[in-house]
């Protein structure tokens, strides 16, 4: 019988990855294109990825694919061949290679069929998410950043912008992409004739945002090719100065990639300079926040005294039950 889902417990998965001796590379990619049967595509793609022992998180929808994966270095070429032949729309698809491969990003393969690749809250039936194609390479980005008449818009969540962003980029204050789209339209409504450059981590959010801006009458919309990851990789390759400062937040176990030595954020508890995200160890909370090492020790990895007390109470209860 075909295996179409992970059936190994989390502890065993961690043991397996720790036992690996071959390094892995984190890769991300996306593509907006029409998938007639997402469930069939998902099952076939899962079998192909699982055979190559690829880990990661992959979303499939009628509007395309969005993937962040971890690949054994010896199987990167085999993965490319498989990907480029799995669907005509994926042939020669751009791959974003992670900026930091010193830490493990994924421990298992998860692949889900979703209604949308990115939850956008858009209700207009005539909206075309495929209508965005003005991509800027790193060298073009650096030139445009020097022009005060051009607006750079960060389409990531506020906690991502907090730890790193392009110099002089405008933040659209919100915690989700769904919230961000109407706010962006309102904030920029008097700039429909100006050149606007949008960016995000790897490109998928700013591509949909670019199409939405064009749909709403904005005339000159551009996006950074490959997002922050694509920009940094190309800038480093060409020896260009990096105009992105700080850390690039990522949605995997690493929670961030160091781009420059600048630390532009602060610990949410003591306000000292820090840009390390973590999740509150109180599982009833699990809040994502920035915490320095001193506060990690002081609060037992929790975001508040209340969560710390809840965690300690739970640990005490577990110890007492174990003794019994």
Swiss-Prot record:
Catalytic activity: uridine(34) in tRNA + AH2 + O2 = 5-hydroxyuridine(34) in tRNA + A + H2O
Pfam families, per the entry: Rhodanese (PF00581), Rhodanese_C (PF12368), UPF0176_N (PF17773)
Residue intervals of the Rhodanese domain: 146-233
SUPFAM superfamilies, A to Z: Rhodanese/Cell cycle control phosphatase
Superkingdom as given in the UniProt entry: Bacteria
Signal peptide residues on this chain, from the entry's feature table: none
GO biological process entries: tRNA modification
Keyword DNA-binding part of the UniProt annotation: no
Role of this protein: Catalyzes oxygen-dependent 5-hydroxyuridine (ho5U) modification at position 34 in tRNAs.
Name of the protein in question: tRNA uridine(34) hydroxylase
Organism this protein belongs to: Baumannia cicadellinicola subsp. Homalodisca coagulata
Gene: trhO
């Amino acid at each position: 019988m075909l295996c179409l889902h992970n059936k190994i417990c989390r502890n065993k998965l961690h043991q397996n990855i720790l036992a690996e001796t071959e390094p892995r590379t984190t890769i991300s990619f996306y593509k907006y294109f029409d998938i007639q049967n997402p469930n069939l595509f998902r099952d076939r793609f899962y079998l192909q990825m699982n055979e190559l022992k690829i880990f990661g998180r992959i979303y499939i929808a009628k509007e395309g694919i969005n993937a962040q994966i971890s690949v054994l270095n010896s199987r990167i070429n085999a993965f490319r061949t498989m990907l480029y032949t799995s669907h005509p729309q994926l042939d020669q698809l751009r791959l974003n290679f992670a900026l930091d491969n010193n830490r493990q990003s994924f421990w298992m393969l998860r692949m889900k069929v979703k209604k949308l690749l990115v939850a956008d809250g858009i209700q207009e039936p005539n909206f075309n998410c495929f209508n965005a194609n003005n991509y800027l390479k790193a060298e073009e980005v650096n030139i445009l950043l020097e022009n005060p008449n051009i607006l750079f818009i960060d389409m990531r969540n506020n906690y991502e912008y907090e730890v790193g962003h392009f110099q002089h980029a405008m933040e659209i204050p919100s915690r989700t992409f769904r919230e961000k789209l109407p706010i962006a339209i309102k904030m920029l409504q008097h700039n429909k004739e100006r050149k606007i450059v949008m960016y995000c981590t790897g490109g998928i959010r700013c591509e949909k945002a670019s199409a939405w801006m064009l749909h709403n009458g904005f005339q000159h919309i551009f996006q950074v090719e490959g997002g922050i990851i694509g920009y940094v990789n190309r800038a480093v390759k060409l020896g260009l100065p990096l105009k992105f400062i700080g850390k690039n937040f990522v949605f995997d176990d690493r929670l961030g990639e160091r781009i420059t030595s600048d630390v532009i954020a602060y610990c949410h508890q003591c306000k000292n300079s820090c840009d390390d995200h973590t999740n509150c160890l109180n599982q009833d909370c699990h809040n994502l926040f920035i915490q320095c090492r001193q506060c990690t020790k002081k609060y037992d990895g929790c975001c508040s005294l209340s969560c710390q007390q809840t965690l300690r109470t739970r640990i005490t209860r577990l110890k007492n039950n174990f003794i019994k």
